[in-house]
Structure formats: C-alpha cells, structure tokens
C-alpha cells in the first residue's frame, strides 16, 4: 500500500489534493496508521516522528500526490467571559489543569467535560455546547506540522474515552468517512490496532 511519508503545513502547498481525510483532534496525532480518504484512496501514514496535524495540512504520498487533512467537527464547550480580564482568568485556570484549549477572540473552547464545565461556571463563565473543529494551542513544547515539512509525526487515536489531563482530554467522537482504520499496521511503536466503526484505536502515542 502506498505510504504518506511527509507533511506540508497549512498554506505551504498549492496543488490540487488527490483526496482528503476527515480527522478529529485525537486522529490528528499519529505516526503510523492505515487511512482511507473521503474519495476512497487507501494509504498508510508512515512518518518518522510525532507531530500535530492541523486542518489544511497536506500529507505527501510517495508518488507525489497530496491528501488534505480536514479537521472534523466534534463536541466542544465554548466558554465565554464577561470581559478580557475574566477571559484571561478563565484561561489561567484551564492552563493550570493542562487542558488543551483553543483560544478564540472572545472565548475559549475545550473538549466537553462536565467537571470543568461546573468549575468555569463557578468562576462566572457562560458555557455553550457546540460542534466545531478543535484546534487547541500547541503549547511551548509542541511540534507543529509545518516544522515537519519532511517527515515527523505520530499519534492519532479515534473514538472512545481518551483521557488527557495535562494532556488529558475526554473525547467521544465518531466519523465514517475520510476515516482512519488501524488495519493492524505494526511497528515498534504500535501495539495493535482495533478497527472499530471506521476509527483507529491504536497505541502509538507520543
């Protein structure tokens, strides 16, 4: 099966993509995984190191074709503050818990978490449940995909309860198309893959 061995970051490619893969936040963190695009193109993501893929990135196949990464909508909490100072205070509390957080102009977005929802409401925030792509801040030590224009990526986990507190998230998500199946692609970082509802449950974490 053809492999995707490199990544081009957002705005670093102009050619038409041969296909696209629809991936949630967890699924955009994988090093090696069998995938099928929305138009049926099957390939194996086979990168050298872990890197966070973002919507708009392109996976480069061995024959030069590109596969666009599309960030899937998923269940989120949008946290709204009364003023900028309040927003900074809320962001501090989320950061203190090492929660992946997407910073918007006037709000914050996190994965749905009832405990955190209760906490920020207690701090005076307004919380709204939404469905949207999740693109959190990478953190001081994150390795962005554009830094990996060659081949550096890893990790991507589908569905089920993924905990990441300090890296702890709680995700319950499913997509049927542009999906990633693990198809038991094994390497030294991968234990075993479970193909389940068009999602990968693999264990090659960062």
UniProtKB/Swiss-Prot annotation:
Domain of life the protein comes from: Bacteria
Major place of residence: cytoplasm
UniProt key word Chaperone: yes
Keywords: Chaperone, Cytoplasm, Nickel, Nickel insertion
Region (Disordered), start-end ranges: 136-206
Compositional bias annotation for Basic residues: 192-206
One Pfam family it belongs to: UreE_N
Basic and acidic residues composition-biased segments: 148-169, 177-191
GO CC term, one of those recorded: cytoplasm
Single Gene Ontology BP annotation: protein folding
Family: Belongs to the UreE family.
Protein name: Urease accessory protein UreE
Species annotation: Bradyrhizobium sp. (strain BTAi1 / ATCC BAA-1182)
Gene assigned in the entry: ureE
């Amino acid at each position: 099966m053809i492999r995707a061995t490199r990544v081009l970051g957002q705005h670093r490619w102009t050619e038409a993509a041969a296909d696209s893969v629809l991936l949630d936040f967890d699924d955009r963190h994988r090093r090696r995984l069998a995938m099928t695009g929305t138009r049926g193109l099957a390939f194996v993501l086979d990168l050298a190191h872990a890197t966070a893929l973002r919507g708009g990135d392109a996976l480069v196949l061995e024959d030069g074709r590109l596969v666009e990464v599309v960030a899937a909508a998923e269940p989120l909490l949008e946290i709204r503050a009364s003023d900028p100072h309040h927003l900074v205070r809320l962001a501090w509390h989320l950061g203190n818990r090492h929660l992946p957080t997407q910073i918007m102009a006037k709000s914050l977005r996190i994965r749905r978490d009832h405990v955190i929802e209760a906490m920020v409401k207690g701090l005076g925030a307004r919380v709204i449940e939404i469905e949207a792509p999740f693109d959190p801040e990478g953190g001081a030590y994150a390795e962005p995909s554009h830094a990996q224009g060659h081949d550096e990526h890893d990790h991507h986990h589908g569905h089920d309860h993924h905990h990441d507190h300090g890296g702890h998230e709680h995700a319950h998500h499913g997509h049927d198309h542009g999906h990633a199946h693990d198809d038991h692609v094994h390497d030294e970082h991968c234990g075993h893959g479970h193909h389940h509802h068009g999602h990968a449950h693999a264990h090659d974490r960062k």
